[in-house]
């Protein structure tokens, strides 16, 4: 574990709009690496990455499709390792934004959950509709419409407090909590 002092200054980076380091017209981790000295000169003690995991992009990367990888458009794991090593050489910390309220609907866990493949069956919050085809409850999504969407494959509604493409994980399920622990240990 790492206890960070409360007085540290972090520079939050969304690489896509930060700096293009590989010449493809989009910011990436290679560009972040090139600017580490500049960030250090600003007086920052570390960098905080907005989500840089593989994502379909329905919500700026917050719809994560794989927690244990870096999106190829940002340079993949090789670029991340370069940034991490470069930051540590400059005595800087690196924080990853980790969203575990929900995943992308393209995440392997969700795809298996909607098909009722164990142990993933209850990795998400699923409910049957009420009589007369009504939603499980009247909750609204923070993004769009209601917090429930019917899934034709499973024949039930899944909850999404954010975007439709961001099904909520069932944190009451101990297997889900173990998966989150695996992700934390990985990073």
Which residue stretches match the model-derived regions?
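Acidic/aromatic-lined carbohydrate-recognition and catalytic surfaces
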Residues: 3-181, 185
